[in-house]
Every structure is written in C-alpha cells, then in structure tokens.
A protein has these predicted regions:
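Extended, charged helical/alpha-beta scaffold domains that provide interaction surfaces
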Residues: 451, 458-482, 489
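Charged, surface-exposed helical/loop "interaction arms" that form contiguous linear patches used
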Residues: 360, 364, 374-377, 430-431, ...
Length: 881
C-alpha cells in the first residue's frame, strides 16, 4: 500500500452511509439485489434484534465491514420486529432496474416506518386504532391531534394539560410528535413509557399548519370542519403533516377530513379510572379479563375499533344515547335478522385499512378482491336494516354511498383468485384487454410448443432422455446425458458441461425463447397498467367507502350490543337529566361471566342522589364483594353511556360527566412515590375536579399509612365530599368502622354493608347489600381460607380477643399465651411487641382524652382540607410522634 494513501469505502458502502446520514435516527434496510442489508452499527443492532447472523462484507481498501441481511420477500416479517422493539426503520429501495444501471444502482428511502406511522398488518392490532399524536403547548393550554394513517381517522382537541392527559390515556397513541426540546417535559407529565419523536419549531406555526391541512383536504377553508376554535389543535395537526412528509408518506388520499373532540360532550375518565375499572386491560396482566374482552361481540375489526373508541370516550348526549338504544332494541327483537346482519358484516373484512393501503398505492390484488367482496355485502345489510320504523336505523342506512360502479369494475377486472402480486401470476381477468389475451395465448402456447419440440428432437436424434429446461443464466437449453452425447447433431451449440450431462442451445430454441419472454414482459407491463388504473379508481372512491365503513362499524357495534343483551340478559337503561342513580338488581358484567357452572352472581340495588343519599359508607368483611360492587356500579353507568344495555333488571341514570375511581394502588418507584403517596395524589386529583354529575368510587382510602392517620384522612375526605363536593355521588368502601357515625352527623351520608352469615367458626359470604354499618371484617377467617399456618391463626385470634376486650392495662401475648404488661409512653400510648393500635374513641388516658376533645371541638362543617391536615399535624406533635 502506498504511503499516505487514503482508505476509502467501496461505492456501495459510500452510498449506504450517504443515505444513513439523512436518517441518522433510523435503522437503515438497504436493498441490494434480492436482499435487504444493513452495515456497520446497524448490522450489529439488526442481528441482535432479529436474531439473524452477523457476518462481514468486503469493503475495498478498508477490508471488511459488519453486515446483516435477509431476503427481500421477508421484509414483512422482519421489519415489524424492529419497529416493535422501539426503532424507526428507513427502507432504502433500488430506484432503477439494475439491468439498465450504467454504474451504481440509484437508491433512495421509500418509507420511514415508525410505531405511529404503519400500514403493515404485522404492526397493527386489528381491534385497536394506531394513533400518531401531535402536541402543541402554550402556557397552561395544550392542543392535540390524533391521526391513524391506517384508517384515515383524524381528530383535534384543545384544553388543559390534565384534559389532554386524559385523551392520551384514552386513545393510547403509539407515538407522539412534539417540538424538539420538549421530550423530557412531555414524559414527566404524561408518562415515561411514551414513544416520542420531534420536529422543529417551525412545523407548529399556525398559518403554515392551516395551509398544509387545506392542501391535504383539497379545500379552500377549514371552516367546514368546525375546528377553528382549536388553534393549538390545528398547530398539532399541521406538525403531523410535516412529520408524514419527513417519513416519506405524502399524498395519503385516505386522510380527507378532520373532526374535533369536544371536552363537554364526553365523560371524563382519567388514566387511574380506566386502569382501576379494567376497561381495556386487566390489573393482573394476561391472566385477567377486561371489560372490552367480555362485551366485544363485533363481527369486523372496524366495529371492534369503534367500540374501543366509545369505551374510551362515553357520551352525555341523551338523544344520541336513545338513538343507540333504539337500534339495539330493534336488533334484539329482530331474531334471525340479527344473525344475518352479523354474518354479512363478518364477510366485509377490514375495509378501512384496505383502502388506506390503496391510498398509498400498495394494495395487493387479493386485497382488491376482498374490497370487492366487502362492497358486495353493503346492499344486503341495508335491505335487512331499513324500513322497520326505527328512525335512527333508517337515518343511518340513508347515508350509505352507492359504490356499485366500483364494485362492478373490480369484479369484471380481477380474476376470481388473483396472484399475490402483479407479475406473480394472473391478476387481470380474461376479456378485459384483447392485447393481454393474445399475449397470454402466445405465452401459454409457447410452452406447449417447447414440449412438442422436446418430443420431436428426441425422436429425430434418438436421444430418449433429452429434456428442455430454463435458467436465468442462458435461458432455454437442451440437456443431454453423457451416455447420449455422441448422438448430438452438429448444429447444436454446447453451453455448459456438467459431471453427468451437457447443455446445448439451438437457433430455433433461442428465437422462440425471445418470443415467449417478450410476451411475458409485455403481459407484466399490461397487467401493471390495468391494475394501476383500477387502483386509481379505488382511490377516487375512498371518501365514499370511508363513509360506508363508518356506518358498517356503527351497525356492527350496536348489533354486538344486541347479542350481548340477548346472551347475558341485559336490559335497556333509562338515561335522564336529573341527578339520580337508581339501579335495580345490578350485576358485574365481567365477574358474572366467570362464575362456576351452576353458580349465579348475586345482584344488588344501588340508589344515589344529591338530596338524601349522596354518599354510601360501605363496610363489610374482606372478600365480601365491596370492591366488586363499586366497580359494577361504574361499569353499568359506563355501558349505559356508550349506548349499550346493562346487566341489571332496570337502571335509571341521571347522566354523569365524570367517573372517578380510587381502587387499589402500587408504588411508583421510578418517580419515588410510595403506595400511600400514589393514593393521595389520585384522591387529590378527584377532590379538585368534583361536579354535581360526578360518580366517585373510593376503596380503602388511608390504608397505606397508620390507622389513626388513615382513618382521619378517610373521615376528612367523606366530610369534604359532603360539604364541598357539589353533591358528587359517592360509594366509599372502608374497614374503618368508626366512619359509620358520619351518618348521624351528615344528612346525605348512609351506611350500608355486605352481609355475611356466621355458622359456627365458618363465615358464609352472602354478597348482599344491606342497610346499616358493621364492625366486623373477618380478616382472620380470610387468612384461614388462604391456608395460613394454624399457629398464625391461633395467635391472631388471641390478639384480636385482647384488642376487643380493650383492656388498657394488659395485652395478651399471642406467641406465649401469657399476659404481658405493656409499656406506657409519656404521651400515654401503649407499646407492645406487636405494636398494637387500640380504638381511638374509648380512652381513659388524659393526653388522648385531650386529643379527643380537640376533634370534638373541630367545626367539621366549615373546616377546609388544609386546616384538617394542620389539626392532624398538631395532634401528632402533642403525642410526640
């Protein structure tokens, strides 16, 4: 090597790094012949994530470079794995036919695939939207845009940071686009697990955003979409259009409209509520059952996605809800027609995503045929649904678009069973194009000719084993085994010698080969043109097809509600404008489906209003069903406010605008928050957002700290909701039996308990809600059921007896069975080996009596939460704690 010579990459590797420099944040898949390859650091990553071999490729003067790759036809298998692993992937294709390239083949990125910008079925959940979100901020306001490129759904919203947080929790975007530099703040506010991408500040400029959207929708103004009052939402939507351009997704014809999400039209449910109610995911991971898995009776992916959208954003519009109830009622009474409608809808498939692939020009021939089959089902569905005297149903059917011309063209143009792709077999039907038919005859006839030539040459030469074959190196050839090579005619031209045979060509063979191959090339060109014209026609019909998709999805959900009601004996709720919740014989929609054979769920009544019974203090044993009762109440309300019938004999519901739950908690270690801190944060958020139409479900508030602290906080919360909560209807489950006395103090507080029956040493859970409080938790019985060692059970029973005796001088030693004198502190509290806490309201110690007097003197009707905490702090100081 010459001294001082600069080592250079080969032209191919130079080109790779040149493209990589344009997309440094992405893994580059680089098309080389029949393979996609990655080099250098990308090769190491690709090998690790995909589990494929990492090897080396020659790189000129530099020796070798790391390489990993896979066959091009396997990209639909490997690309989704990279994206699911959290990587953006740049697909770099050959932009010219290598046969005609004079030097290095021209290449360029044809697509940048990210979690939020995907069309590949392997990356998409059939039953969920795949939202890409954009966020724009201005002081304490935030604008949001949610776009699903796989369906064309495009929505904008604007409001407080917390409100946008509820939308993020509800819609679960797979990727969020923000201004560069905002990544950390967004993750701190909305969650560390979010996938964040960035664009520059200019992408969020309002005027430019408006122009981008007008261009996308091909309109002169956005006024027709009624999004003018959401300027930050428009900025976010414009930024998403910039991001699509940067990821090589331009001119998507399925994105043809935009709508607004109005805060005052939907029920507020924060991420804690959605988690606690297990709407989409069970709290026990893959082992549990979510609400959606029980109620989803949809026959199509489009309906399943709409159902999830309704669950994420229940509505308050009574007229709209009654329209949904009317359709469900009709289907419920329709008998066999319901089954037929569901069968037709099931045959439609996922038209939304099929036409989205058509919008990109990447729709496969078999998907075009599925589109045709889907369109053919709309007419019989309409015939079954119209003219039944159901106004809501007739209105829906009247909005369906006539796509019969497109359907006719698809069915006439395509073969019944098309090949997977143009060039892989027949796609266009016979009779569509006379030139195509003629070329096909030449191609198929040419193959027949070759068979005849093989037979005639075998007879002429006497070489019985002669055969004509084809390969990519020198086309058609005649193969002769060595034992017959002496019989080869002199005009044959030898092309290849093998171990046991020789291969020859003839002038006649080459001439006919050229004719056949020319015909096949022309067939490919003609099929490509005709197919492209059909796809263009589909693209022109996208808005009409999208309208029909939305109607079919709605029918699918409502028909599913009817099946749910039929199978599980649900009844129509009555939605009102008053402030009353009256459920008769309500059941938990999930738990009742999991009951053992022969065992029925015990139904319960719930009544809440703003005048006499605003707050229910619910006590009862462990495992009695308090938490289930809380959840079932919220789930019945939720089902009613998405348009479903409910698991109850009857339900009269004054519509709710917010549903809050505080049920269970876990540590948030990543943020340094304990279980109790998480509990307090969630409860604080609830107390700050109460309204007269709020439904509040609180379960075991205060159990994450000491008994006195927890009980004091629980009591203060109940008092606050009663006095300052604007009449928010509340179910408060607790083991603090001392809270039962609140019924005597506050006019709208009522005590209830879950009944049990004691038979000897056994406890039978009756699961029935009864009036009045209870002072028994039966925790030891539950411990016995859990299989605790008998020594532990005996010790616990001894300790419980001692506590119930409330002997301030002696505590029974559970371990030794002997009487032990406790240690008395300066503040008069008792300490023992078990660190036991005695009842706070039966005292004979002067210090504790003083504290009791302080509590008795507190003006609970006027005290603020802050003053209550100050009082609690001073009491702790007096105790020397």
């Amino acid at each position: 090597m010459a001294k001082g010579k600069v080592l250079e990459d080969t032209p191919l590797i130079k080109q790779f790094f040149s493209v990589k420099a344009q997309h440094p944040e992405a893994v580059l898949l680089y098309r080389v012949g029949d393979f996609y390859e990655s080099y250098s650091d990308d090769a190491v990553l690709v090998s690790k994530v995909l589990g494929i071999v990492q090897t080396k490729k020659s790189n000129g003067d530099k020796g070798y470079i790391e390489m990993a790759g896979f066959p091009h036809h396997a990209i639909d298998v490997y690309l989704p794995k990279l994206v699911r692993a959290g990587y953006k992937v740049a697909v770099c294709d050959q932009l010219e036919d290598p046969k005609f390239a004079k030097k290095l083949v021209k290449r360029g990125v044809t697509e940048l695939v990210t979690p939020g910008v995907a069309f590949n079925d392997q990356l998409l959940d059939q039953k969920e939207n795949n939202f890409l979100a954009g966020l724009a901020f201005d002081k304490d306001q935030c604008g949001a845009a949610f776009l699903d490129v796989s369906t064309g759904s495009f929505q904008v919203a604007q409001g407080s940071l917390d409100y946008i947080g509820t939308l993020i929790a509800s819609l679960n975007p797979k990727e969020i686009v923000v201004q560069r530099g905002y990544e950390k703040g967004v993750k701190e506010k909305y969650g560390d697990n979010l996938y964040i991408s960035t664009v520059e500040e200019w992408a969020f400029v309002y005027d430019a955003a408006v122009e981008r959207l007008k261009k996308q929708f091909n309109v002169e103004s956005l006024k027709g979409f009624a999004v003018d009052s959401f300027p930050l939402g428009i900025c976010s939507a414009g930024a998403l259009m910039v991001y699509l351009e940067q990821t090589q997704h331009t001119g998507l014809k399925n994105i043809c409209s935009i709508s607004r999400i109005d805060e005052d039209k939907f029920v507020w449910m924060d991420k804690f509520t959605m988690r606690n109610l297990e709407i989409f995911n069970s709290s026990v991971g893959g082992e549990g059952v979510s609400l959606v898995s029980v109620i989803d009776k949809c026959s199509s992916p489009m309906g399943a996605r709409l159902l999830r959208s309704w669950l994420a954003m229940p509505i308050m519009d009574i007229k709209e809800l009654n329209s949904r109830y009317d359709v469900v009622q009709h289907f419920l009474e329709a008998g066999e027609d319901l089954d037929k409608v569901q069968e037709y809808i099931g045959n439609i498939g996922d038209l939304e995503r099929i036409i989205s692939r058509a919008a990109t020009g990447r729709i496969a021939p078999r998907e075009v045929m599925q589109l045709g089959r889907g369109l053919s089902q709309t007419e019989p569905i309409a015939a079954l649904c119209k003219d039944h005297g159901v106004k809501a149903l007739d209105s829906l059917i009247s909005k369906m678009k006539n796509c019969s011309k497109l359907l006719d063209r698809i069915m006439k143009t395509m073969t019944a069973e098309p090949a997977a792709a143009v060039g892989k077999g027949e796609v266009i039907a016979p009779g569509v194009d006379s030139d195509l038919d003629e070329l096909r005859n030449i191609s198929s006839g040419g193959k027949d000719y070759l068979l005849k030539l093989q037979q005639s040459e075998a007879e002429r030469t006497g070489i019985s084993s002669l055969k004509i074959s084809y390969n990519n190196v020198f086309g058609y050839y005649i193969e002769v085994r060595n034992s017959f090579k002496d019989l080869v005619p002199p005009e044959w031209i030898r092309k290849q010698t093998l171990v046991n045979a020789e291969r020859y060509i003839t002038q006649e063979l080459k001439e006919y080969e050229e004719k056949i191959l020319s015909a096949e090339d022309r067939i490919y060109a003609l099929e490509t043109r005709i197919y492209g014209e059909l796809v263009a026609e589909i693209q022109r019909n996208i808005p009409a097809i999208q309208t029909n998709c939305r109607i079919i999805a709605r029918l699918d959900v409502l028909a599913g509600f009817a099946q749910l009601a039929r199978d599980n004996h649900y009844n129509r709720p009555e939605m009102t404008k008053d402030l009353t919740l009256d459920i008769k014989a309500g059941r938990h929609p999930v738990i009742e489906t999991l009951m053992p054979a022969g065992e029925e769920y015990v139904p319960n009544d719930i009544f809440l209003d703003n005048k006499k019974q605003q707050i229910i203090i619910l006590t009862g044993p462990n495992m009695a069903g308090k938490s289930a009762l809380l959840r079932q109440t919220a789930l019945i309300v939720l089902l009613a406010q998405i348009g479903s019938f409910v698991p109850a004999d009857s339900a009269r519901i004054g519509y709710f605008d917010k549903i809050f739950t505080r049920v269970g908690a876990t540590d948030n270690i990543s943020r340094g928050e304990s279980t109790f801190m998480v509990e307090m944060l969630e409860t604080s958020m609830i107390l700050h957002n109460l309204s007269e139409r709020s439904l509040v479900l609180l379960d075991e508030i205060g159990r994450g700290t000491s008994t006195y602290d927890g009980m004091s906080i629980a009591r203060a919360i109940v008092e606050y909701i009663h006095e300052y909560g604007r009449g928010a209807k509340t179910l408060f489950a607790t083991h603090y039996h001392e809270l039962n006395d609140l019924e005597e103090i506050y006019s709208r507080v009522r005590n209830f308990h879950i009944a049990v029956k004691e038979v000897g040493s056994q406890v039978i859970f009756l699961r029935k809600l009864k009036e009045g409080g209870t002072a028994h938790s039966f925790g030891i019985h539950v411990a016995r059921m859990a299989g605790m060692p008998k020594e532990v059970i005996q010790s616990a029973e001894n300790t419980l007896k001692a506590l119930e005796m409330n002997d301030s001088q002696h505590i029974v030693s559970a371990r030794k069975g002997e009487i032990k004198k406790p240690v008395q502190t300066k503040a008069g509290t008792l300490e023992s080996d078990g660190s036991l806490q005695l009842s706070f309201f039966q005292l004979d110690d002067p210090t504790l009596e003083s504290l009791r007097d302080k509590l008795a003197g507190a003006d609970l009707n006027n005290i603020t939460p802050l003053q209550a905490f100050d009082l609690l702090r001073s009491m702790k100081d007096e105790l020397g704690l």
